[in-house]
Amino acid sequence: MVNVLYELNFNWIESVPYIIPLFVGIGFFFTFKWYPSQNPGTDQKCSKGYVGYVVAKWVGWIVGTFAFCLFVLLTIAHVVDYREKREILDNNHAIVVEGMVEKYHAQPLSGHDTEHFEINGIYFEYSSGELLNGYNTPACYGGVIKENGQHLKIKYLKDDIGNNIILYIEEIE
């Protein structure tokens, strides 16, 4: 009997950290609106605080624009990465390994380590702290790979630095 334990899916919750630059950008965009309210008259050219207002305005626009662009680029990169991996999985271009889980090492609940194991000499490693499209849920957080001896079929790909990214996990009983 075959039991699908994991299949690559787009998880919006993993995109949440990318929103941080967006909020930083919005905050800096509105700095020049806030500055005159805290320092009345500084938005007038003849006032003593005008230079501070101009600096706040330019810093707000520059940092805000940079943070917004960072948000857009990170989000686009995350979506494109998912689509590429999904296409590899859907077109059966993923590497397949089947066998028993060996040398299993669980990630501790403290999270200061990785979870890793081997199947037929192929090494897999992941951590809950990774923002990636692919399997990265350790057993201590409800992951599906829990112990040595599990008979699994895994579809994966190698990334640019040689890590094996898990796209699909099937338990064979």
Model feature map: region roles:
Residues 109-132:
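OB-fold (S1/OB) nucleic-acid-binding surfaces
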Residues 2-87:
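Alpha-helical transmembrane spans
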